[in-house]
Amino acid sequence: MSEAKAILEIHDLTVKLSNGVTALEGINIDVKQKDLIALIGPNGAGKSTLLKVILGLIKPTGGTVTLFGSKDLNKNLKYVGYVPQSAQARDPNLPFSVYETVLLGRTPVAGLLHGMGAKDRQKVDETLKMFGIYELKDRKIGQLSGGQSQRVFLAKAMVAEPKLLLLDEPTSGVDTSSKKDFYNILDKLNKEREITVILSSHDIGVITKIANRVLCLNRSQFFCGENEDFQADIEIHKLYEHPVELMEHHDHP
């Protein structure tokens, strides 16, 4: 049985910011189809920067990024879904309804010039129902709870049927029950729909339970490998520079 082909290849990646600060250095990872990768590290570790490099929003200073076989990232971004940090997603001043927000997610498929057709609107309806938010379709984004908002932005990312899903601390500020539901949805998308996922989060115990691989960053790369080889207490101690013990609590560590 042949080994799964990498859909994202990052080799010797370095990113220096305009102020001269090195945000990332020496990052190497090959992401294969159906991977669910836990991206962990303290604030300022470069997790968001790495995701923005993959999205083509930040240009690397050195190294290469190959997405679905091409170093021209814009060529294949239509296959990538993105869920931003919850603080960005839950702007109370956003004037859009739930339906309009998810419909915008079809842009990579439908394009801006041709407009949305019946097929696009049907896909939006199906996606809203899949994530259990169809009854919220006319509500404004600013009127939603944290958990509802994150389902909407996950639906927006998924409505274009991506092959790779990037999530940047999607559950910060969200209640425990909503977090559990959100991670269960991600787990199903990965296992049942074979969506490749890179998930940045501080919920280390939870995401390392559902992930098959782990990438630890603090500007440089501390660990990258299989979940079964990840020694949480040791690696997290290195990352955060103080002892950490993961405890079991309810359904989550």
Please report, for each region that a protein language model flagged, where it lies by residue:
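Catalytic Walker B motif of ABC-type/P-loop ATPase nucleotide-binding domains
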Residues: 165-168
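Conserved ABC transporter NBD signature motif
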Residues: 63-76
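Conserved ABC ATPase "signature" region
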Residues: 103, 118-136
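Conserved ABC ATPase signature
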Residues: 140-144, 148
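H-loop/switch region of ABC-family ATPase nucleotide-binding domains
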Residues: 201-202
